[in-house]
Amino acid sequence: MKSLMMNKLLFLQRITDSPSTTIISTFIVTIISIVFLYTVLLIRTTKNKQKIAAPKASGAWPFIGHLKLFMKQDTQFYRTLGTMSDKYGSVFTLRLGNQAILVVSNWEMVKECFTTNDKSFSNRPSTLSTKYMLNDTNSVVFSPYGTYWREMRKILVQKLLISNQRSEALKNLKTKEIDNSFVKLNDLCNNDVSGGGTKVRMDEWLADMMFNIIARITFGYQSGGGDAPGASTTSKNVERYKKTLDEMFVVLATRFAVSDIFPSLEFIDRLRGLVKDMKILGDELNSIAGCFIEEHRQKRRESLSSLLSLSNESVGDEQDFIDVLLSIMDQSRLPGDDPDFIIKIMILEAFAGGTDSLSATLTWVLSLLLNHPNVLKRAREEIDRHVENGKQVEVSDIPKLGYIDAIIKETMRLYPVGALSERYTTEECEVGRFNVPAGTRLLVNIWKIHRDPSVWENPSDFQPERFLCSDKVGVDLYGQNYELIPFGAGRRVCPAIVSSLQTMHYALARLIQGYEMKSASLDGKVNMEEMIAMSCHKMSPLEVIISPREPRRS
């Protein structure tokens, strides 16, 4: 038995050691390796095939890509992108320098961006202007998504805007400033000796009103309050701030930054003097804001020396943003290394985000009403029906005025001031069936979404009634109905939607209730041409013949 086993082992050893066996073993290993590598490559190929890239727009030039589209002087960029989406689909890509841009013009795809992929799209791209004028790393609007941004957003929303106490305070401050603006409008009307009405640049009047509202709620400036102690100095600083802010908007609208397309070429913007000009404007705005902060600190010191309660330094509804932020500094600390600098940034963002957009929207509203007198008539009848004869419309009446609300919705649908919303991806993701690599810039064409014929019947027509008697009755402006997102959506949605709408509703209701208005143009029509720009602004001034409305008879 033992010898039999030994013979078998010797036989196996001879077979194993033979050259033919070695060749067979090598062949088998090679075959297995080839099959394994083929399987790996097949899996990778299949996976890559599943990563479908969005359609690429043709016509890109070497080096600059589709930059020529941004430079067109005969049509608005958002309209150009809208035409391209008709050709390439609601999701496509173009190239700006070496940067890939994903253009989205469909509400369902936008919903996917700001729900499923909201974290991926939670950052805004940095530009030369945000870097040197808006201090993007410390900004609530432009700072990277993370702990700092969340803390700043929480302070803005909970301490400055949304809490019941602050909401009531803001309402009172805005109402007082709107009242002041209508006093000035009445003064203009009183200069009319012909009885035919006074010609007023209403776009300028609306812009002044919105600036004064923001000035009132941020640093407590009262327009027309010239008799108050220190009012002269404060008024001069306010005028300086307004002038510098206007200059900033001009730079943003007219000065092209090469480094926004090619970041490595910032030296060209320095040689052109653009960086210097932006720094000067940013420093000037911060310097003036510093004066307002010091004024508030001085008042607090005076309150302490008079043994007054620090919390009552600005009585109840008179507390402005600086008051609240200084109180937060007393109790804890603002995020960041320089609390004063943070306050300056928040002041600037309040003006940058609140003055131009609201005044531009109301300018569009009034233009549409003048071109649609039947809508204006119906809005006035609604106010007369819900507001007692002889009484002035109040903020508390606004919830009853559904047609006024529909007018504002329809205007913001047709003419969203922020016609394009921009983000960029921090990680690879998918939109629809398309793969989006990390670092891709996202451009949401809000203007195109608002005019989608598959969503909106007669999308180019001004029809406020669509929000009162169709499937759009429940559609609002708060960023949850993605077919109507003039304030944006997702984590970066505008935090001041409620306050902004309240301001526009009340100002518009006062204007409709109190004044007869018609276009000052010879044909009686308002020119609705839009500026050639990234945003949606009216091209020509809005001149209106306006006169106080006769009291209605019972």
From Swiss-Prot:
Its cofactor is:
heme
Q: Name one GO molecular function term.
A: heme binding
EC annotation from Swiss-Prot or TrEMBL = 1.14.14.163
Instruction: Point out the coiled-coil segments of this chain.
Output: none
Q: Which UniProt keywords apply?
A: Alkaloid metabolism, Heme, Iron, Membrane, Metal-binding, Monooxygenase, Oxidoreductase, Transmembrane, Transmembrane helix
* Reactions that this protein is recorded to catalyse: (S)-1-hydroxy-N-methylcanadine + reduced [NADPH--hemoprotein reductase] + O2 = (13S,14R)-1,13-dihydroxy-N-methylcanadine + oxidized [NADPH--hemoprotein reductase] + H2O + H(+)
GO BP, sorted A to Z: isoquinoline alkaloid biosynthetic process
For this protein, the record's InterPro entries field holds: Cyt_P450, Cyt_P450_CS, Cyt_P450_E_grp-I, Cyt_P450_sf, Plant_Cytochrome_P450_Monoox
Q: How does this protein lie in the membrane?
A: Single-pass membrane protein
> Where located?
Membrane
Q: In which tissues is it expressed?
A: Highly expressed in capsules. Expressed is stems.
A single GO cellular-component term from the record reads: membrane
The pathway that the record names for this protein is: Alkaloid biosynthesis
Residues that, per the record, bind heme:
494
Membrane spanning residue stretches: 23-43
Q: What does the function comment of this entry state?
A: Cytochrome P450 involved in the biosynthesis of the benzylisoquinoline alkaloid noscapine. Converts (S)-1-hydroxy-N-methylcanadine to (13S,14R)-1,13-dihydroxy-N-methylcanadine.
Family recorded in the similarity comment: Belongs to the cytochrome P450 family.
* UniProt protein name: (S)-1-hydroxy-N-methylcanadine 13-hydroxylase CYP82X2
What is the scientific name of the source organism?
A: Papaver somniferum (Opium poppy)
